[in-house]
Amino acid sequence: MWLITILATISCVTAQLSQTNPDCPIPTCTILPPPKTTLDNTKFRVVYTKDQEALIYATNFTSPFNNAQYPLPTLGNHLNRSYTLNYDKVFLNIADSPDMLNLKTSWTVVNNSNLCPLSPSVYRSTSPLQTLTTAEQYCFMTTATLTSAFLYDYTAMKPVGYIRARAEETISFFSIMKTNMVNRPTSPSLSQAHTHTLAAMRTTATGIQAQTFKPQTGFFIVLDASRARAVTNPLDTAIQPKFSPSFIKEVTFDHIFQTTINETARSVTRETTTGYIMNAAKTGALYKASPAYYLFLISSDCRLQQALSVPYDFSLGRFCPASMSCCLNKGYEQYYVNTWLFHYYNLKRLNVLNLESSPVSDHFIQLHRTFNTEHSMHCDGSPYASDTTYNIALLRDTVQFLNGTKTTTPLANEIPQLTDSLGYLKYQPDMVDASDHQNYMAYVTYLMAIFYPTFTEAQKFEFHNLLQSVCYFDKGSISRNQAYHSICHIISFQTTASVPYPIELQIPFTTEPTSGYNAYLVKTPIGSVAIGNQNPFDGEGVCFLTTCIYHPTKKINQKLTIPPVRWQVVPEGIAVVTGIPPNCLGYETYTQGSSFFTIYNDSKPCQPQTMQIAQARSVITTVYSAAQKSDIFVQPYGKSSWVNGSYQFDQFVGGALNLRTLTFTMRKPTQLYVLDPIEGTYIIPDYQTKFPLLTSGTQTYYYDPDQTVTNTTEVSKVTIDFSIRTMITLDPLVFNCEEFICDKDPTCRTQFSSYCQTTQPILAALKDAFEKYNRSIADYTSTIRALTNTTQDLFASATPVRYRRGVEVPLGYGHDLEQPSWVYDLGGTAIVPWIGTAVAVGKLANRVASIEATLYQITQGVKQSIQSTNDKFDKITNILHTHLRPVTEGLVRTNEQLNAFSKQVRDQFTMINTVTTELSAYVDQLQQVFTVGAFYQNQILQVISQLNSLQVYVDTLTSSFTDCISDLNQKILSPACITTHQLLQINKPSDNLGLKNVLTHYINGSAATFYHLTSTKGVYKPLPKLFNNTHFLAPTTAYNPVTGTCFFCGSNACDKSVTVDCDYQPQPLQSTILAVYPTPTGLDLLTITSNKTFEIKHGSTVVTSVAIPPPPILSSTININVTFQQQLLQLQEQVDQLNLQTNYTTTEIQSIIDKYNVEIQNALNQIVDFGPGTPSLALWKVILILIAVVVVIVIIATTIFCSVRKNQSELPLQVLSRLR
């Protein structure tokens, strides 16, 4: 199989090679690093894990950049491309901090060859720098000395501690340059040399067109990698610290560290160069939520700065000329082959959570098989992370198949059918055309992701050599045709020295992918698999700075312009990045619990290794020349040196190692956390580009089309269906004892005759009960369907502009206030009907309030009727279980008798030890009878199991329906009411502003809740949550019930230690807004106040104020049924009572009352659906639907109740008599 894979890969790679260049691929540069004069800012970065933990790190970098463009090298016949340093794409806009480093820097030319640690052969003794001549090679040295660094809290705007070393630490940078002076200043000074001299240097070799020296000052990192979560079940599976990245194993810190700590992190998570497709091939269950991935992100940022500081020291060695013979025969370079072997060796030794041994992998796979064609999807319906899910499943099956633990795997058998005879991926309509970039390479990547883990080490080494022969690598190049996921990059485990990180990782989570290509769909036996460079996050999500992305994710395009939320740091650890000389180095590692500290000692350096320097490039090597001491510690700001600075260690590992390039030493903090994280995604909108919708007082509200599901140009409908899809079905022969057990066998009939005579009456009663049960289920389904017909989310037409009309089923009341809880204030209303004129409102207002109050009681009857119906079905189920039990017990007794009798015959047969034909035939008969009896008993047990399943299904359905009604009562269209797919059908952003006044926001892709309109502050706020009967609270502060005050909450966390003023001062709820209607001067409101007084305001004038009488009490229990006529009488009494108190006469609204009565009569014959009409008619129809549903429920409930009562009285007597 591995040989087939290699051949397929060769053909694919060859096909890619042949499209633009018959020889080797062409390197291209896609990194656009960018113009900023000087970067000397301390950057705090906070990475949240959505619990009370966070990873925080800070970087500091100083470099004399200018706005010039720096051309890339021209190598042989390859293309010449340029790049521009663009720090806006790398660093987020966070306020600059005070200088983190107390740094002193000097820059000189080394005139003594003995003092230059690089190869003396390239050194030329010269005069001072001011008199540099042409075509000479020089050794430059920069020395940076630092004494301390601050840990700075940007929210509190003060230092929280600083890192202190007893002795000054010095970092020296050496550089060898062969220069050709161009436009040399006539009399440059030493300070001018910093900005002019190096920019004027040009090399005479053919590879380098421009070389700029940029000194690197170092990084300071604080992070906590002690916790991780499994991708398979992140909510309740916590990976222990031993599965986190560990640097204290009893191994030497050798080659794995030569390209920064990200290789260790990548080895733990089985991440590959680009960090994408091979996620599917790793056998570890750690993924994006693990600290290893955070280390990967942090090291990516560090390495980017390192690469910008020294842009050409990561591509050592020579390259093949543009000829196929060189590519295939000489290979790329042996250095990289050895490096890969070291990585592979280290990877084999690491502790990795094995997918095969973890049952959570099955849970993860099943969890993502929620849809028919995709395992998951985005909010917009596109496939989500299908490649990860599918490949994990396929990898598990394939590995089990190759290990012999599975005899066959259909998925593995399907793999060869995905290609044609040449190994190319077969064309499908939803695939990119074959001439485009990634088409074939995607399949090769997929194929290798499946089979690469099954290779032997010898096969992997052979395959790696093959890849090295046909693939081209260079810093800044992606691969053939800029395909991001070239098999060369993904499979070969290339070091970061040869392949850059993709721009998506350099700018984590803050930008759209810049690769230019979306994922491709590959149809497989279990669904469409997305393979490509857009890789959403599995697990429960990740927060970076103030942006949180959860599953399923939504693309977010914005610049983060505010600092991280308030956090508290206990600075108990530090990671220091320093330059280490290329020599023998002693190290000591002390551990205490999960913390560790590594000290390097270069006081006795070995002879430096001679580095081969190609003529086509210059090499800058960093050298750290001062010994680190074991007494480096973290000293809290403003406290004495011994506070929080002493550590006891219980384990020590020491040794020596041989390093070539940078080494990162890590010391983990033992405590780092965020207080009370708040769930949710908060997007800062650019409100200047939004449409102003309305103004209330001094506040302007804006409309954001990306935050609403309302579409005013078309009528949409959401179907909510709670029907039971299947009835209980049984083979009719089950109810005929002898035919079911014996068919036509006379011997069997004889044996079971007496048994069937006893059990046949019970089976007849059971059959009758089943038929009644199925009829009851049909009635129950019909009832629920009738009720759900009233819960549809419709749009009605009142003006040429359509608007959203939400149906209230039921129009219930909140738990805390005796009034509807679905509206809090203007601009935050869940559903606000727009009414035409103030006159119309004045005539209809009292009637609206009266009917709304009465319907609350009717709704309670509806709820109780549903509960009563459910209680009846529970009783029916219990009756069936009661009568099945004697049947089962009888079968068990018969089975025991047959067993006992068979045993007696066998014992007698053994004792006599005489074989006779007659006895043998008799025993065979008994065995046959016994087998048939057991089969029959099994059928009955299946019936019982089916009943149990149905009862669970009915209970689940009832619970879901109850939850849906409850959610609708609070104006939340929850997953209990509607599927994600249905919700997506109406989630079509509209460019037509219209009268949109409902903002919907998605939480985890399914539940919809309603949000405020955008205010001039530019922040979306969820509706305030009631926490008692008289107050409400805004979400940017949190209420402390102990102190009665509020404390600060950011986008991700709250800080209980800081007391602030509440966003909204506690005040009584003024009113509930029923409607908004326009006036020439603005907006008027129709409200019900909290003291149950109905008011109509025109401007600031109260037109009328009427007290609302208490509604009548409607009761509906299992023994008392409220008839529809009684409910109508009570409703009419309520209307009459209100008419006596209103300021309007009956004649003024008689036409409305007449129309209302006609609608009531029509509702008795059918359930009315919405259609075009006036707003007032639509409101009446809401009421009519509810009344009609009450009629249907009461009638059906009465019928079911009577039938149950009859069943309760008759069935037990019949069964008991027959059993006797």
From Swiss-Prot:
Residues 16-1181 are virion surface. Residues 1203-1220 are intravirion. Keywords: Coiled coil, Fusion of virus membrane with host membrane, Glycoprotein, Host-virus interaction, Membrane, Signal, Transmembrane, Transmembrane helix, Viral attachment to host cell, Viral envelope protein, Viral penetration into host cytoplasm, Virion, Virulence, Virus entry into host cell. Residues 1-15 form the signal peptide. It is a single-pass type I membrane protein. This is Spike glycoprotein. It comes from the Viruses. Homotrimer. The chain crosses the membrane at residues 1182-1202. Residues 1118-1169 form a coiled coil. Its main location: virion. GO terms for cellular component: membrane; viral envelope; virion membrane. GO terms for biological process: membrane fusion involved in viral entry into host cell; symbiont entry into host cell; virion attachment to host cell. Pfam families: Spike_torovirin (PF17072). It is found in: Virion membrane. Belongs to the torovirinae spike protein family. The keyword Repressor does not apply. Mediates the binding of virions to the host cell receptor and is involved in membrane fusion. InterPro entries: S_torovirinae (IPR031412). Glycans are attached at residues 60, 80, 111, 262, 403, 601, 644, 711, 774, 789, 1004, 1028, 1091, 1121, 1143.
